Amino acid sequence: MPQITLVFISLSGNTLSFVKRLSLYLADNYDYHVKQINIKDLKHETFPVKEEFVAILPTYLEGGNGVDSGEVEILTTPLGEFIAAHGNAQRCLGIIGSGNKNFNHQYCLTAKQYAKRFGFPLLGDFELRGTPDDISRLAQLIMEASSRHSSNDTQTLPNS
């Protein structure tokens, strides 16, 4: 059974709820085993992730509007530290952002910042706890990213 790892941080429970439902969907519909790493549980510890993973990040920013001010991440920085440590960013297939669309420009801004900072794609987004449509859409995008990564690995193998 193939495996995918979801590395995330959940502060209010919305992201955790989404990750649990996404994990079940990936298992039931794609026969994937999903390993979950909630950064909140690690208490600022880091370690090398050996396998490919997808990061899932809620948006927590300091006030403002995300244009003139309010672009500074708060509360979720341990996920960025984890991705930056031990070369983990190189094994990240991409990031999924979550947020609240009421915050306009700030919606999923932190995930966009991580994609730019680490050089991996923003795979998609969902609002609050996510809907069943979000689960199926993002599961498909994860599978596509995993497939692209696998085919790139195959192309870089030396000819025998």
Swiss-Prot record:
SUPFAM superfamilies per the record?
Flavoproteins
Query: In Gene Ontology terms, what is one molecular function of this protein?
Result: FMN binding
Entries under Pfam families matching the protein: Flavodoxin_NdrI
One GO biological process this protein is involved in is: protein modification process
Q: Which Gene3D superfamilies match?
A: 3.40.50.360
Q: Which family does it belong to?
A: Belongs to the NrdI family.
What is the designated name of this protein?
Answer: Putative NrdI-like protein
Taxonomic lineage is:
Bacteria, Bacillati, Bacillota, Bacilli, Lactobacillales
